[in-house]
Regions:
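Predominantly five- to eight-bladed beta-propeller fold
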Residues: 24-35, 81-82, 162-222, 250-253, ...
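Beta-strand-rich domains and repeat architectures in extracellular enzymes and scaffolds
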Residues: 46-82
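Conserved beta-propeller blade repeats
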Residues: 52-66, 98-116, 135, 142-157, ...
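Short glycine/acidic-enriched loop and turn motifs that connect beta-strands
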Residues: 72-76, 119-122, 164-167, 254-257, ...
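Short loop/turn segments that connect beta-strands within beta-propeller blades
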Residues: 88-92, 129-133, 207-210, 271-275, ...
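Cap/lid segment of the alpha/beta-hydrolase catalytic domain
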Residues: 255, 440, 449-572, 579, ...
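Active-site-proximal cap/loop segments of hydrolase catalytic domains
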Residues: 514, 519, 527-723
Length: 723
């Protein structure tokens, strides 16, 4: 459930994937850049939703011109729309070239921009000149195009279409067209927020170089698999060889229970000339060992092989410029979605693999090859910040940046120039050029999408605070202070509980869990990098699996107790808030906080871990983190501890008001968890409230729902912490 890392990985290096429109008829809606209201002087839910959100970014090969998409939301119509911009970095001039498009990339040596648009009713590939002229639809596929990737010679294009190849859910009976029931025969019948009635497939189409992309042929014809992988994969999971003769692609070729319990995806090489496929991860004679599906794979034979067979997540391939090598991100162990992501390099000349980031004791996010074929740039989190790095093929890693922010690598322009996006707890994403000189990266901001917000609103300071844990270790916490903070006053404070549970508390900007809007409401926020978070070594990361309520919970309490030593913190007005595993944390703390807190808010959290095992869809996750199914009786230690310390077992000790929030389309953690917690609280006479969203998943994506979320959030906190 490592959602933040998954989203960072989905920030495409060279490809495109369609942004899901907000609203059923969003394809025809034009939303202009909204006019923000700064009268309050501080960030509000309405002003937060008025900010532009920078999406896909691309540069010409010389780095002189960039194109990027910005999504704007209209609160009244409850819809969003993306506008494509071009900026000349030599003249510093920016102009909009298309309203209603997204995922722009340069084609034809930087003279035109290809992108996705639904302007004519279905999602198709369009092209427009960099001056905004001659916009035209260049694909006319029968199905929506969900993503596209041009070959280097631009004679072919990969188009992503959904195909109706899933037999887990039976098709409707012809004489019952209005029947809504689904006959389900196996796992995985649902994923994230959708029932699995179709799968994305790559189609290879011809491009005439001017105005027409052909219909395309299914590269995985007849195969019941996904490419890209659901629910978050885009065309970063495919790559063209430099000679345009081969395609590398990511695929997890499994079905049923095996699909639901295994993370073993591989990198395959497809030859266009003879239509043959080779698995680059495993030898041709590899046979997957049998497994017990209801037990953790940690100690099973699939993870005990002496030969390197890449049995974990392998994805996002990229060829070196000369075509000799291909690199991809690789996890070592099957069933462990939060394993460290390494860079694996395959040498076509020798047929050997090597791992070139072994000395970096954290995960690789986005990456890109240097033009010299001997170095790779990448981003990765360390000590609560995501920086840019470079490694050579011998595994010598150099850190290039050291800024208080999170970078995401977009494109390697040259050995000395990188294109990146950058955000922090004080700033939303903007585009930067990073100049690399003498093993150091110097960042230069090139977009200023939300400058008026930063100039016209007051912002709180963000400071690092190291806290001693109960076992004598050091825990990094971010502390966010209200604007115009006055140390002579006393402020209510919030403990922010991170989700994942293996997602970093880095310098992230969120349009929902936004630290600045909490600070703008005069709360001090402490956000701990508790046990289980990446960026502090593998031991720290792995101390949470099988122990959800041990040291990680003590880390939370150590953080808030340490903050309460400050005279400006009112320890009689403390709250705890969090989503996903953070919601689990809140539910557990509600029965174990020893009267520290006066208010709780849990969003999409797990209330009953036994219930969670049989309700969630990606079963590899509870198998690994909870150590097995709840009915398994062998290996009793960690497994029984995971279920024996479920939050619902402490509800008799609940004594504090709690707000339970959940989306009813959340298949990762079902909304029945919130209903159960809310019912238990009310039956015990505890002041409680529940906010349900029938049309939202694990996140809240619609403008009016987002504002309702924020208003309800602060009304609840203010009721109990600002008396």
């Amino acid at each position: 459930m490592n959602f933040k890392i998954m989203l960072m990985s989905a920030a495409l290096m060279t490809g495109t994937m369609q942004i899901h429109a907000q609203g059923s008829d969003a394809a025809t809606v034009v939303v202009e850049k909204p006019r923000a209201d700064f009268s309050s002087g501080r960030l509000t839910p309405e002003s937060l939703w008025s900010m532009g959100r920078i999406g896909n970014v691309s540069s010409t090969t010389d780095g002189k011109v960039i194109t990027y998409a910005v999504t704007y939301y209209d609160i009244k119509s409850n819809k969003g729309n993306s506008v494509i911009y071009v900026k000349d970095l030599q003249t510093d001039k920016t102009h909009a070239i298309f309203n209603g498009g997204n995922s722009p990339v340069f084609i034809k040596n930087g003279k035109e921009i290809a992108f996705l648009s639904s302007r004519n009713g279905s999602s198709q590939v369009w092209s427009v000149g960099i001056n905004g002229k001659n916009a035209r639809q260049i694909s006319h596929a029968q199905k929506d195009v969900e993503g596209f990737l041009f070959s280097p010679d631009e004679k072919k294009v990969i188009l992503i279409h959904s195909v109706d190849n899933n037999t887990v859910i039976e098709k409707k009976e012809n004489d019952l067209p209005l029947a809504t029931g689904m006959v389900i025969n196996d796992l995985m019948y649902k994923h994230w927020d959708q029932y699995n009635t179709s799968s994305p497939h790559p189609f290879i189409a011809d491009f005439d170089g001017a105005s027409n992309i052909s219909e395309g042929t299914d590269m995985l014809e007849g195969e019941p698999f996904e490419c890209p992988m659901l629910p978050f994969g885009g065309v970063e999971q495919l790559a063209w060889s430099p000679d345009s003769k081969s395609i590398a692609y990511t695929c997890r070729k499994k079905v049923g229970k095996e699909y639901a319990t295994s993370t073993d995806s591989d990198i395959f090489l497809y030859d266009l000339s003879n239509k043959t496929t080779k698995n680059l991860c495993k030898p041709s004679n590899y046979a997957a060992p049998s497994v017990i599906y209801t037990k953790t794979l940690q100690d099973q034979s699939v993870n005990k092989t002496e030969t390197d067979c890449n049995v974990g997540y392998d994805q996002n391939p990229q060829f070196s410029p000369n075509g000799r090598y291909i690199a991809w991100t690789s996890m070592e162990r099957d069933g462990y979605e939060s394993d460290r992501t390494r860079l694996c390099v395959y040498d076509f000349k020798t047929g050997t693999k090597s791992y070139v980031t072994e000395v970096f004791e954290s995960g690789v996010n986005e990456f890109g090859w240097d033009a010299d074929n001997n170095h790779i740039f990448f981003s990765g989190v360390w000590h609560g910040q995501t920086q840019l790095y470079r490694t050579d093929l011998k595994g010598h890693v150099k850190q290039l940046t050291n800024d208080t922010c999170d970078y995401s690598l977009v494109q390697v322009i040259s050995s000395k120039l990188l294109l990146a996006k950058r955000q922090s707890m004080q700033r939303a994403d903007e585009v930067y050029l990073v100049n690399v000189r003498k093993d150091k990266g110097f960042a230069h901001q090139v977009t200023f999408e939300n400058k008026n917000f930063y100039d016209n609103l007051e912002w709180g300071d963000v400071k690092a605070r190291w806290v001693k844990t109960v076992d004598g270790k050091q825990e990094l916490c971010w502390v966010i202070y209200p604007p115009k903070f006055d140390a002579s006053k006393k402020y209510p404070a919030l403990l922010f509980c991170e989700g994942g549970p293996q997602s970093p508390v880095s310098q992230f900007w969120s349009f929902r869990w936004n630290m600045q809007i909490m600070a703008a409401n005069d709360y001090i926020v402490i956000a701990p990098n508790r046990r289980g978070l990446p960026g502090f070594g593998m031991e720290w990361l792995e101390e949470i699996s099988g122990d959800y309520t041990g040291l990680c919970m003590q880390d939370y309490l150590s953080a808030i107790d340490d903050l309460c030593k400050e005279t400006y913190v009112d320890k009689e007005r403390l709250g705890a808030v969090g989503a996903s595993f953070g919601g689990f944390s809140v539910y557990w703390l509600a029965g174990n906080h020893n009267k520290r807190f006066k208010a709780f808010i849990a969003h999409d959290g797990i209330y009953n871990t036994q219930q969670q095992y049989v309700e969630t869809e990606e079963l590899w996750f509870p198998n690994w983190d909870l150590k097995s199914a709840p009915w398994e009786k062998t290996g009793a230690g960690e497994m029984q501890k995971a279920y024996a310390t479920s939050p619902h077992l402490y509800v008799d000790k609940w004594d504090t008001p709690i707000l339970c929030i959940h989306g009813q389309k959340d298949f990762r953690i079902e909304y029945t968890q919130a209903e159960s917690a809310f019912t238990a609280a009310r039956m015990r006479g505890i002041d409680a409230q529940m906010l349900l969203f029938p049309d939202e998943n694990h996140w809240v994506l619609k403008p009016q729902n987002g504002i309702l979320w924020q208003r309800t959030f602060f009304r609840w906190l203010n009721k109990y912490l600002k008396k």
